[in-house]
Amino acid sequence: MRLNFKSLPELLAFNIKYYRYLNGYSQEKLAELCKLSPRYLTDIERGIHCPPISRLDVLAKALNIEPYELLLNVDRDKKIIQKMKSFRQYNQK
């Protein structure tokens, strides 16, 4: 399933959330691994902040991927995307 993104920060935000979900990390855990504040990571995932390249490298290493993968719009597993949406809705209650 290929998604449409309006901007690079939106694509980056989705990919960070996607790979974070695949790794089973909470925002707090990923922030800790990357030595970021949880609030800053939340803002990245909401597309409010676009991190510098040096941070992309740190995020990618923590997510067990190559940095360029954070910037790719490729087909994603529809089932995983649905699980991510369900998880997000559950956590917002």
Say what each PLM segment does.
Residues 71-93:
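Short, charged recognition helix plus adjacent turn
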Residues 1-11, 81:
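A detector for short, charged/polar N-terminal pre-domain segments
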Residues 35-49:
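Recognition helix of helix-turn-helix/homeodomain-like DNA-binding domains
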Residues 10, 21-22, 50:
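Short amphipathic helical patch at the helix-1/turn junction of helix-turn-helix
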Residues 14-33, 58, 85-93:
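Short basic helix-loop element that most often maps to the first helix and adjoining turn
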Residues 54-69:
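DNA major-groove recognition helix of helix-turn-helix/homeodomain DNA-binding modules
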Residues 16, 30-31, 41-44, 70:
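Conserved hydrophobic/aromatic packing and binding residues within compact polymer-binding modules
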